[in-house]
């Protein structure tokens, strides 16, 4: 006697097996993804405050700032790095800013895991032609004043400038 299983049972078993496989894959890859994210954040901190040899995480009391680290060299504070997430034209943009003790920008890093700006336009905000112009500047920054916009990406360029100004204001208020 040939007995067929109802289609809903077969479909349910396939869904159960697929769900278990996805859950197992997530369980195995989650620690690796977290480790890579931490390494990427550390690399960004070191790029924007290159004189620092160590970083010490600080408590953040500002909802706009994602995190802030004190940059140290020979046990002395030489500056700060902070990350802010701003809303660009294509979505969220993570901006890591390095600032020395005098409030002067030592570098910025633009991007993030969810960076989805338009290729050839907003994506150019990640390029050195845009990010390098921030080095040596201090607050207040203005688009078309002391920072040039990326052509065709004024929304994203403006969001980044506003985010950097927010970080500069935050760092200026820290006890040094």
Regions of interest found by a model, annotated:
Residues 2-176:
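Flexible, solvent-exposed loop/hinge segments and secondary-structure transition points
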């Amino acid at each position: 006697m040939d007995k067929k299983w109802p289609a809903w049972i077969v479909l349910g078993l396939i869904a159960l097996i697929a769900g278990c496989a996805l859950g197992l894959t997530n369980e195995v890859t989650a620690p690796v993804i977290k480790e890579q994210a931490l390494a990427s954040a550390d690399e960004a901190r070191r790029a924007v405050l290159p004189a620092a040899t160590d970083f010490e995480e600080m408590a953040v009391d500002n909802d706009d700032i994602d995190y802030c680290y004190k940059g140290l060299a020979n046990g002395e504070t030489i500056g700060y790095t902070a990350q802010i997430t701003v809303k660009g034209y294509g979505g969220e943009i993570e901006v890591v800013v390095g600032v020395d003790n005098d409030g002067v920008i030592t570098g910025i890093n633009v991007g993030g895991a969810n960076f989805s700006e338009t290729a050839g336009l907003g994506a150019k905000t990640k390029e050195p032609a845009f990010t390098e112009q921030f080095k040596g500047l201090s607050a207040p920054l203005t688009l078309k004043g002391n920072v040039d916009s990326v052509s065709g990406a004024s929304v994203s360029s403006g969001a980044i400038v506003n985010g950097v100004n927010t970080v500069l204001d935050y760092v200026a208020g820290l006890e040094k």
